[in-house]
Amino acid sequence: IYFEMPPGHFSYWNTTEENREKIRTLIRSGHIDCLHSYGDLATTRAHAVRALEELEKHGCRLKVWVDHAVAPTNFGSDIMRGHGDEPGHPAYHADLTVAYGIRYVWRGRVTSVIGQNCHTSLVGIADRRHLIGSLRTLAKEMGKQVLARCGHRKYTLHAPNRILQRVRLSGDKFQGYEFLRSNPHWNGVSSNETGLGIGEVLTERFLDRLTARRGACILYTHLGKLGSGRKRFNESTILAFRRLADYYHSGQILVTTTRRLLDLFSENESVSPISFALPFWNRLTFPRL
């Protein structure tokens, strides 16, 4: 969820009080678990204060921060061009946001590698059905790996291929985690990362490779982007989610929320996904809205 957006964009302040209550219900139930910056129009610390006071007032707790586009309140100053952790900047808010409870931040890092928290492998990126495009994607990922091993800060997360890494925000005392997301589409991390195109991502090829590697994945996607004039998922997307559900119900893939997965790995930092017992999680039941 985000707060300050232009007219026509769904956000907390742009909707009705009835819909805001629905948002709060979904935060409390755990279905909405990420703060997606404070929005495109949030340019000052005061905007952050207003949003955090609203969340606090209604008992809504979020632990995950996800940078959005190039919003001023983003934490990532390189890819996402944010200023949220720059003391002295009008958009600085890191101290307030961390005090509120944010523990995990995403600052724009995305990989094409299928499966994290297992050894780095570029196998599965190249696809002979889309040879030229997939080889281009493979070359980009190889470049990230080389730069990461040369100490390039932008790609620090890529070399170990771990979902989480301890991080300190620039100019702030925040001791938390930065996390890595993945989009395994053959044409690169910015392809079909939408509700319209996710059917081209959640393929049998990807799911089989993920299960074979026994890895983890926080998928990079924007499910609300359905294409011009569309209000529902298309048939390809529906079939993709049914496919994922089949893998879940057959015990091959654990499907969970971002916050739950990050909590799991932060509590088991030194081991791989196959080395620890999965916790007992209360079933997420969609609330009556």
Specify the residue positions occupied by each region the protein language model found:
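Catalytic alpha-helical scaffold of carbohydrate-active enzymes acting on polysaccharides/glycoconjugates
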Residues: I1-P184, G197-Y220, S228-L289
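His/Asp/Glu-rich, glycine-adjacent segments
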Residues: S190
